[in-house]
Amino acid sequence: MARGKRSTQRDADLELESLQSEIESESPQPVTKSKAKKNKKKLNKASAFNSDNDSNYDLKPEDDEVDEEVVPVKKKPSKKSKKAKANAFEAFADEQSVEEEEEEDSEKPVRKNKKSSKKASPKNAFDALADDMDDLSLDEEESESSEKSKKKKKKSKSKDDGSEALDDGDIESSEKDKKKKKKSKENDDAPKKDRKTRKKEEKARKLASMLESENKDNDANAAPLNKTDAFKDGLPSGRLIFAYASGQKVAPDGSNPADGITVTGNLLSPPNSRDLQVEKLSVSAWGKLLIKDSELNLINGRRYGLIAPNGSGKSTLLHAIACGLIPTPSSLDFYLLDREYIPNELTCVEAVLDINEQERKHLEAMMEDLLDDPDKNAVELDTIQTRLTDLETENSDHRVYKILRGLQFTDEMIAKRTNELSGGWRMRIALARILFIKPTLMMLDEPTNHLDLEAVAWLEEYLTHEMEGHTLLITCHTQDTLNEVCTDIIHLYHQKLDYYSGNYDTFLKVRAERDVQLAKKARQQEKDMAKLQNKLNMTGSEQQKKAKAKVKAMNKKLEKDKQSGKVLDEEIIQEKQLVIRFEDCGGGIPSPAIKFQDVSFNYPGGPTIFSKLNFGLDLKSRVALVGPNGAGKTTLIKLILEKVQPSTGSVVRHHGLRLALFNQHMGDQLDMRLSAVEWLRTKFGNKPEGEMRRIVGRYGLTGKSQVIPMGQLSDGQRRRVLFAFLGMTQPHILLLDEPTNALDIDTIDALADALNNFDGGVVFITHDFRLIDQVAEEIWIVQNGTVKEFDGEIRDYKMMLKQQIAKEREEERRIELEKQKK
């Protein structure tokens, strides 16, 4: 029984792949083949998806010359009834209506051009569907005459034998035939191609539904087939499972990123293109329109930075591509980094190499299917062969070690299993996987989260020098990374995708100039309206009528400009502005507030982390801690907070000193069932609700976001709640461990202003070079058991890191060249 089900499953999978290929070509694949050339059709139309206009689906590739082949049918078609060509799908529908009556008849092969062969009868529903699809490719004239002949024979037989009247199914079929013929006459001018496409898509859906039923029978624990997962541009797709670098499409909470996303638009890129171009793109998530009638243009070889405030739809757009909701050319391979690698028994190296093996198996399966018609699929076969060659590198292990070490993995960590790593390190594993496989379109959603400065510097160098011939689409809250990496900026603003050449600084300059021009234009419109209003008050009735019409037209145009983002520069600044302010600490603490005296530390049974540290902190301190991963930056914060005690030496603190810590795990303290105001009142119950709402508003939480459960807030909004909590404790010294994760650029700038205006001390760890540049007055390097002040600015430190990376890269190239010479 189980073997039979697996056989059925394999048949279904093969049929799905075959059907997908047939629909992608937008023309039925011929089963009856002739050496005569078919009429060639130009590939000059856009392919639409989720569109009401079916004519936009048309992709008309050229038909190739093919050999002749024998096709089994259920009855030999009549040659006497040949007429003008009719729609092949009408014949197919008619054939289905009499299918039950023909089951007892034996199938006979029809000789086509004096050649014959036999085909086995279908054994299950999937085979039956396959035979139905084969019958569609018969010559349309023969299909029509065959079906008419069958109907006549059936009717004649029914009358002669005195058989019973037609059952309800036959009556319904007869009525449907009449309606179809009538509709065919009314739509003679309509393109037949569209009807065929729609019929094929309907068959694909039915087949996918049957496949889902089989999957449920075979494996009760298997995840149900989701239409979003199974279809790409309405087509069955086997590639989508490999589109996520994490190795999983389902989020940690069990949700599918594609759930709730709807997309419309037209694909412009031809099948063999390495670009992704879509016009009239609209994207919605859970009913909220995020992108409206925009163009998506991703040109091969360019590196795009996608920027927008949190909640605007950046991640939704990336998921829409990765989930197949936005169609892509068949030759374009893509991966998305959006979450950490799923923990398992694989080591770090094995986990990275695994993505290579999965991709290779997938490509080989695709190639096997395409080899059924190598002439027709020559372009796709060439693309797959090139991709397979790229995957078959002799130094794969060396590349994996290079990437992992660049992401600051130690040799000890590399040897660990992935289920022994924290979520932050598994995020680096997922990043290493996508960098190793290096798809044609690489999508990175906040890749610098969970990285330290050294890893960020290495990643910037890698993306800048190793992406030739590949396209990058990245969302990132680090302005420095956007400046170092990006050749173009895509600004998602007012539901539109606006494109700017250059990096982030260039975007800011061009955007500011454009805003000024828009402001001038808007002011001029207002002046013109004021003049018209004055004339309106001073003229006669006829002139007043004309002036009123002109004022009305200008008002309408001004309103349209405002809706499209063309507003005054004061309004633009107000929209972008966000203010965060920490409560004053009150002072009263003499310097030094904290003093380290010959402090050494090691965990029980572990190596020495610090040896004889001597330094002090006060309310004027603005210190950024930098250094390689594992050097002890977080441990130093714990020593300051007295969460761990020195092995030797002492840490002296003022008795009235108040400290506050922000770290990656503070979000666990939040009660997601409560609103921000409710949760803060549980911590500071003496403050009335009105005052609490005013305080929360300082941190960018206004209106509805103050009173809805925090489970409905974004990660960035929840971080603002934590900032509000820290500020209300009125600490003398703020300790921040990676505060910028999940914040957008505007919020990071607001945080920098808040720290600069804070009257207490600040000690922080961050991977954001720009935040350090904005806030830090001292840079301390934590390395080799010591803490030393860096003599220079953060730009100098970053330049030093990049020089080391460049030196290592040149050394590797030299070694490779020597190997090639040998």
From Swiss-Prot:
Residues forming the ABC transporter domain are 276-519, 594-809
Q: Where is this region: Disordered?
A: 1-230
Q: Where in the cell is it found?
A: Cytoplasm
**One GO cellular component from the entry?**
cytosol
Q: Which residues carry this modification: Phosphoserine?
A: S27, S47, S51, S55, S97, S137, S163
Domain of life (superkingdom): Eukaryota
Q: What is this protein called?
A: Uncharacterized ABC transporter ATP-binding protein C825.01
What is the source species? Schizosaccharomyces pombe (strain 972 / ATCC 24843) (Fission yeast)
